[in-house]
Structures are given as structure tokens and as C-alpha cells.
């Protein structure tokens, strides 16, 4: 156990060491300041603007949101077309046929919304063209969209008496060119050097040791997709087993690299926020709140998996190894599970369906908190900002003062946008789950019975309703109902909060800051950190405790038999 603790501490320290300079770099990218890559990339940036006819004029929230929706709609149609027509497209050495309408619809919605829910196995369903041109491109632009919207939200707090929140096309292009592409290139090269597959060759047929039996070994341009799937908190695997598959994640070292990649940008964005508002203590307060919840989750899942529950009492074991890779063990699997669900990533290096009941509860609850414990790139932090405003509002009600955050007064319109930002994902999750358990097709999709069977359904719709994408693998997802309803859930969960965040930003940008007084609530001390954690956890608990009681909590009590 002490080695697991040392591993976790080393991981968190290394993550912070890498994230701080990256956050400073991203702040410079946000404000348009020159960076060390500018000499190489500025000509590319200018050429890109001319090629696309991009105006650098500021946009209102309405126009910014319209640009996001139009761009995402084009991407959605493009991905659907690629998936349904892949049988006629190049780079298809295995002759993969086009996907059905419902599966293509679900997959397009999944990747456009940065969810990467997969109701298919990549190596047996998709061609190289579909993976690299269709899905990998969306991994870049969906991540860039989330960061661009966060830029707009931050401007709302640092600008005053403005009617605009920035330019979407400029933000999108700069995020992709200066942040995502360089990081992905470095990570892809590093992964290839460690044995991750990157090839356009045909699948390889090999002769096994079992009486000369033949086996088909899947290949493909995996490393380039894995790099951005982790950095962009996308999570969709090139292969069906995701990061549990040796061709995606061959060693403990690559496991460390991929976990760092999952959390690197979300953590760096918090650092960037502190720089942007000219008060690093604000960023540290948010970081501390996120990190406390994250560490508690790591401890809970690790203890649950290491000691395996009442069923193993009195038995000498090395922990619950069902569904885990020996090369990662309990420690590496638990840390990965916590990271991927805290960060809205969804990649897995172990089967979450095989986690102990309480071990599976932690990833589920991380998602149900609204993916704000670091969360998705961009979306996680603007979601947390919504919770911060809610916390300030509640505190203001308690003391009878007009609430304010970063010098901007919180008004009824702001709270309406915050309510949309916070409440849409849990409502989608609960309604989707309730509707699903009544459908015969969904009941037939569940491998387990009783409380664990309900947990599989709840986890699936929690994942889609919060744009995570991971799953309890016992749930058979490729049905018309799950594909269509899940696709709509993913789109609503992505774009309704996103639009609300933009309108919140515009309203904030139009205000003049007010001077802090002796009665102003400090949002950077220990008391506020505790209050913020309480609000985040309480909203999640009030929303999901009844459902959790029917699922993983009830499943835990069955282990006492």
C-alpha cells in the first residue's frame, strides 16, 4: 500500500510541476501575446485566417454561440457521412462496411460533443480513414471548442462595459495551433517510442503457439489518436479495450504519461485562470477545492480495490484484480479510473464494470458532480465557475448582501444561466436512466441482474449525460434506443451549458467592477474552499443519492452475504 501512496503523490507533484508553466503559456495564447512558438506558427496563423476569411472582430454571445453550433453541425454531418460511407472510402484494408444510421448518429454526436462514448469496437468496425480523418479531427476541434468557450467566459470577468466575448474562429484556431497540435505531436512521438502502434499497414496474421492456429493482429494509426484523446479529454479508444490494450498503453511508463496527459490541460487551465484575473490566489483556491475532492476519490477507490470488501475478509490477496491489467495493478488502475472520470475523459485501463461496488461508485459520482473536478478541457472550469457563483450567491443570502465574484455583482439573470449550467446534466442523466430502465431493449442489454444491473444502466446514462464516455462494459450499448437517446443526451449536455456559459460571460463583460469592501466575501480563503466543496458535493448528493442507493450502494451490501 505504501508504494501505491508514493506513486499517487509522485503523480500529483509531477502533474503540478508540468501544469504551472503550461498554464502561463496558455494565458499568453489567450491574450494574443507572443510565445516561443510564435516565430514558426504566426505565418501559419495569418495564412489560416486569410484562407478562411476570418474577421478578428469581437462577437456577442449570440454570434459566438451560433458559430460554435454551426461549426459543430458541420463536423457532425461530416463524421456521419464518413462513418456511413467508409466502405467506399480509402484506407480501409480490412474492407469495413459503413455503419448503421443509429450507430453513425450516436458516434458523430459522441465525438462532436467531446464525449467519445463508443457503442462499437474500433478494430472490428472502423477503417483507418474513419479513425484518423473522421474521429481524430473531431478530437482536436471539440477540445479546442471547449477551451475557446472558457476563454470567452474568462473575458466576461476581466473585461468591463463590453458587449462582446471574443472571436470564436480566432480562439479556435489559436487553441488548436498553439496548444493542442504541439502537445499532441510531442506525446504521439513519445508513445511511439514506447511501442504504441502507428501504422497504415494491413492487419497482421500470425501463427500462435496453440497448434499453429492463426490470429489476426489489428494495427493502425493509433498513437496519433491516443495523444489527442488523452490531452483533449476525449477518451475514445482506437481499439475496443481502450488503454487496457497493450497497443495503446504497453507499460507502466506509458500509463503514467497517459494519466498526466488526461489531467494536464484541465489543471493548467486553472493556473491560467488565476493569471487572467490577475489574482493567482483565486486560481489556487479553485485548484485546492478540486484537488481535495480528487484525492479523496483516489483514496476511496484504492482502498476499496486493495482490500476488496467483506467477501475477501480473512483472505490474503493483492487486491481485487478482476478486470485489471497485471502490468498496472490496483494502484495504477485506481489512479487511472479516478483521473479519467474526474477529467471527463472516459478512457479506461481496467474494466470499470469489474470494480468493487464502492470502487465503481467513485468514478460514477465524479461524473455526477457535473465533471467539474478538473473536468473536460474548458468545460470543466466553466462548469466549476458556475458552482462558484452558486456558492457566492448562497453565501450572500446567508449574510444579506448582494453577492459578487471578482468584482462583478451576481444578478438574477446570471443565476438563471448558472442554473442551466449546473442542472441540465443531472436532469438528462436521471430522466435518461428512468426512461431506459422501462425499455425492454435496454433491459435485454444489461448483463447483470439486481443492483449491479441497475448500476450498469445508471453508469451508462451518467457517462453520456455528463460527456464522459466511459462505461460499465456489461451494458450492450449498440441498440437503436440507446444510440438515438444517448446521442441527443450527449448533444444537449454539451451545448446547453455551453450556451448558458457564453450568455453568462456576456452579461458579466457588460458590468463595471465594484470595489471590494469589508463585507465582501473572500473567494480565496479556506472557508470559501470548504463552502465550495460542500456545494458541489451537496448538489451531486441531492441529485443522485436515491439512484446511487438503488445501484452501487445496494450492490455493496450484497457483498455481506
UniProtKB/Swiss-Prot annotation:
Highest taxon of the lineage: Bacteria
Locations listed in the record: Cell membrane
GO CC annotations on file: plasma membrane
Record InterPro entries: KdpA
Protein family according to the UniProt entry: Belongs to the KdpA family.
PANTHER family: POTASSIUM-TRANSPORTING ATPASE A CHAIN, POTASSIUM-TRANSPORTING ATPASE POTASSIUM-BINDING SUBUNIT
Name the record gives this protein: Potassium-transporting ATPase potassium-binding subunit
Organism of origin: Listeria welshimeri serovar 6b (strain ATCC 35897 / DSM 20650 / CCUG 15529 / CIP 8149 / NCTC 11857 / SLCC 5334 / V8)
Organism classification: Bacteria, Bacillati, Bacillota, Bacilli, Bacillales
Amino acid at each position: 500500500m505504501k508504494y501505491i501512496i508514493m506513486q499517487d503523490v509522485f503523480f500529483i507533484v509531477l502533474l503540478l510541476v508540468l501544469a504551472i508553466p503550461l498554464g502561463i503559456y496558455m494565458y499568453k495564447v489567450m491574450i494574443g501575446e507572443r510565445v516561443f512558438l510564435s516565430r514558426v506558427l504566426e505565418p501559419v496563423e495569418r495564412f489560416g485566417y486569410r484562407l478562411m476569411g476570418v474577421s478578428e472582430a469581437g462577437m456577442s454571445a449570440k454570434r459566438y454561440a451560433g458559430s460554435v453550433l454551426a461549426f459543430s453541425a458541420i463536423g457532425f454531418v461530416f463524421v456521419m457521412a464518413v462513418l456511413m460511407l467508409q466502405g467506399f472510402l480509402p484506407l480501409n484494408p480490412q474492407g469495413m462496411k459503413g455503419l448503421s444510421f443509429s450507430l453513425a448518429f450516436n458516434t458523430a454526436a459522441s465525438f462532436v460533443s467531446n464525449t467519445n462514448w463508443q457503442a462499437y469496437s474500433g478494430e472490428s468496425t472502423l477503417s483507418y480513414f474513419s479513425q484518423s480523418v473522421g474521429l481524430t479531427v473531431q478530437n482536436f476541434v471539440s477540445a479546442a471548442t471547449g477551451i475557446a468557450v472558457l476563454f470567452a467566459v474568462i473575458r466576461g470577468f476581466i473585461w468591463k462595459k463590453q458587449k462582446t466575448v471574443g472571436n470564436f474562429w480566432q480562439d479556435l484556431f489559436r487553441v488548436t495551433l498553439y496548444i493542442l497540435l504541439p502537445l499532441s505531436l510531442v506525446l504521439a512521438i513519445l508513445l511511439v517510442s514506447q511501442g504504441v502502434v502507428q501504422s497504415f499497414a494491413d492487419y497482421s496474421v500470425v501463427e500462435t503457439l496453440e497448434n499453429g492456429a492463426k490470429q489476426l493482429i489489428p494495427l493502425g494509426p493509433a498513437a496519433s489518436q491516443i495523444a489527442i484523446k488523452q490531452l483533449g479529454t476525449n477518451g475514445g479508444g482506437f481499439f475496443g479495450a481502450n488503454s487496457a490494450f497493450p497497443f495503446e498503453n504497453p507499460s507502466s511508463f506509458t500509463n503514467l504519461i497517459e494519466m498526466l496527459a488526461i489531467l494536464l490541460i484541465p489543471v493548467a487551465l486553472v493556473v491560467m485562470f488565476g493569471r487572467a484575473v490577475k489574482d493567482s490566489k483565486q486560481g489556487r483556491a479553485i485548484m485546492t477545492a478540486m484537488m481535495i475532492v480528487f484525492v479523496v476519490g483516489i483514496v476511496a477507490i484504492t482502498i476499496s480495490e486493495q482490500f476488496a470488501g467483506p467477501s475477501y475478509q480473512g483472505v490474503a490477496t493483492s487486491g481485487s484484480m478482476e478486470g485489471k491489467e497485471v502490468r498496472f495493478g490496483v494502484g495504477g488502475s485506481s489512479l487511472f479510473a479516478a483521473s479519467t472520470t474526474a477529467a471527463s475523459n472516459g478512457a479506461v485501463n481496467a474494466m470499470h464494470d469489474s470494480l468493487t461496488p464502492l470502487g465503481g461508485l467513485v468514478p460514477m459520482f465524479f461524473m455526477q458532480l457535473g465533471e467539474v473536478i478538473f473536468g473536460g478541457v474548458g468545460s470543466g472550469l466553466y462548469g466549476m465557475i458556475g458552482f462558484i457563483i452558486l456558492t457566492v450567491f448562497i453565501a450572500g443570502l446567508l449574510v444579506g448582501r448582494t453577492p459578487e465574484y471578482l468584482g462583478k455583482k451576481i444578478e438574477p439573470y446570471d443565476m438563471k444561466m448558472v442554473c442551466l449550467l449546473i442542472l441540465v446534466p443531472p436532469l438528462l442523466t436521471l430522466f435518461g436512466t428512468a426512461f431506459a430502465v422501462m425499455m425492454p431493449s435496454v433491459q435485454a442489454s444489461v448483463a447483470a441482474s439486481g443492483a449491479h444491473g441497475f448500476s450498469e444502466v445508471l453508469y451508462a446514462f451518467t457517462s453520456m449525460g455528463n460527456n464522459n464516455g466511459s462505461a460499465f462494459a456489461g451494458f450492450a450499448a449498440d441498440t437503436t434506443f440507446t444510440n438515438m437517446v444517448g446521442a441527443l443526451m450527449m448533444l444537449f449536455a454539451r451545448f446547453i451549458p455551453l450556451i448558458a456559459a457564453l450568455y453568462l460571460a456576456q452579461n458579466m463583460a457588460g458590468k463595471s467592477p465594484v470595489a471590494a469592501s469589508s463585507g465582501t466575501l473572500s473567494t480565496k480563503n479556506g472557508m470559501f474552499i470548504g463552502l465550495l466543496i460542500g456545494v458541489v458535493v451537496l448538489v451531486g448528493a441531492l441529485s443522485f443519492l436515491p439512484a446511487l442507493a438503488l445501484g452501487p450502494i445496494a450492490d455493496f451490501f450484497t457483498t455481506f452475504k
